[in-house]
Amino acid sequence: MVQRWLYSTNAKDIAVLYFMIALFSGMAGTAMSMIIRLELAAPGSQYLAGNNQLFNVLVVGHAVLMIFFLVMPALIGGFGNYMLPLMIGASDMAFPRLNNVGFWLIVPALVCLVTSTLVEAGAGTGWTVYPPLSSIQAHSGPSVDLAIFALHLTSISSLLGSINFIVTTLNMRTNGMTMHKLPLFVWAIFITAFLLLLSLPVLSAGVTMLLLDRNFNTSFFEVAGGGDPILYQHLFWFFGHPEVYILIIPGFGIISHIVSTYSKKPVFGEISMVYAMASIGLLGFLVWSHHMYIVGLDADTRAYFTSATMIIAIPTGIKIFSWLATIYGGSIRLAVPMLYAIAFLFLFTIGGMTGVALANASLDVAFHDTYYVVGHFHYVLSMGAVFSTIAGYYYWSPQILGLYYNEKLAQIQFWLIFVGANVTFMPMHFLGINGMPRRIPDYPDAFAGWNYVASVGSFIAMISLVLFIYILYDQFVNGLTNKANNKSVLYTKSPDFVESNEIFNLNTIKTSSIEFLLTSPPAVHSFNTPAVQS
């Protein structure tokens, strides 16, 4: 056991470890969000006894757990490590031991994050950790320092993983697999790795300066010493905006594969899809100040960031319409992954539309720091990144495990989370338009109605996640029975347009699903092909 799981250098085992920590963190983050929603279900103080600091500690815990310990480990560490070598015909990742270190840095990071909530009054700064609220005057204990260490460790982990993904993709493709034949999920992880590589050092620099300000009397963000807290915001958001694309681009890759498989046809405009992802990634670095319209930027600066932000809608639209064109005229099977993919298309588009509204500097003056923003980013994260994670699990887990989930239960779980998430986050837009501020545990009575609706929706979504845990249990215990009883709607193992590993160099058809041509579950080393350079 110790040899296999503690010292593991096998990408598949490390991916399983990533999934385990993602599931654990996701449950913890969901629990925190439920406490937040219970507190906000009615005006006045409900459960936190007026402890507003604790409310903000829950907010920062929920955010950091969901972003750094659920979505990134699941989509990048889990699906990335497991599927990327299979899809390019590599026997493992390029640096297997680096992979192991990358995972085991996540665990102390999680410990640091949990500890930060337990010392003094916790880090009640919001996930952005803005000074002067995060300065030593406003947060005097070591809580913020521990949160900074957690960010440092996850950053190093992600950087090591990114280097690994880039080198693997460039150097370990099988014979005949040119970059143009790379499956879309591999492209997604590849582009994501570059985004991480370029954005994380900036975050690390920013929080390191904050650490020095707090403990070693420097004045990077201290006005009295000639510093400027706005510098921190620029550094943070130069990471923070690419980060949201880091969270969603692997989801784009998963959705492409699912839509293609269940429509029985290749993705419409595959090269365009790759260029769209690359454009989104590049433009993501040029728009960071749209998070800061109200800090006193010049009018021409605001005009630039408004225009640049709206340009990102173009490659995103290319992706949405290409997915729709893939579905159009296909032989559609509405199995669970396809339901999630179609829901993703609708809900991600809604999130994108509210994003276009927020891109306008003049409108954002009204919307900034209201629940409109919360509604917007939960549509793209909760119903974009998380939906694509669950979709990817339902799509690949029968192949990964050789065990099948109960299709009927999975469909019920889909409809529950679909209804629950919408009922939770749609009212937030209405609250935001009416001016309800974020990160405040109490509110005027006028906001009571929609807040109650949102809290009911969060309860529905939580029930669906409990059902998801039961579906996992059922899959591990009764997986073979489910397969035998046809309780699972099986996809065809290899759609007509998929070509096998041996004939890459003989044809020009771009394959997208070698992983389904392997044994189920795959062997410890699925391929023994030598690494070749194109």
Swiss-Prot record:
Catalytic activity: 4 Fe(II)-[cytochrome c] + O2 + 8 H(+)(in) = 4 Fe(III)-[cytochrome c] + 2 H2O + 4 H(+)(out)
Residues that span the membrane, as ranges: 14-36, 57-79, 146-168, 189-211, 237-259, 266-288, 303-325, 338-360, 375-397, 414-436, 451-473
First-level EC class: translocase
Binding site for Cu cation: H241, H290, H291
EC number per UniProt: 7.1.1.9
Pfam families documented for this protein: COX1 (PF00115)
Coiled coil: none
UniProt keyword rRNA processing, yes or no: no
UniProt keyword terms in alphabetical order: Calcium, Copper, Electron transport, Heme, Iron, Magnesium, Membrane, Metal-binding, Mitochondrion, Mitochondrion inner membrane, Respiratory chain, Translocase, Transmembrane, Transmembrane helix, Transport
Cross-link 1'-histidyl-3'-tyrosine (His-Tyr): where in chain: H241-Y245
Entry binding sites for heme a3: H376
Entry keyword Cytoplasm: no
Subcellular location: Mitochondrion inner membrane
Positions annotated to bind Ca(2+): E39, A42, G44, P441
PANTHER family: CYTOCHROME C OXIDASE SUBUNIT 1 (PTHR10422:SF18)
Self-association and partners: Component of the cytochrome c oxidase (complex IV, CIV), a multisubunit enzyme composed of a catalytic core of 3 subunits and several supernumerary subunits. The complex exists as a monomer or a dimer and forms supercomplexes (SCs) in the inner mitochondrial membrane with ubiquinol-cytochrome c oxidoreductase (cytochrome b-c1 complex, complex III, CIII).
Protein's name in the database: Cytochrome c oxidase subunit 1
Organism for this UniProt entry: Candida glabrata (strain ATCC 2001 / BCRC 20586 / JCM 3761 / NBRC 0622 / NRRL Y-65 / CBS 138)
Gene designation per UniProt: COX1
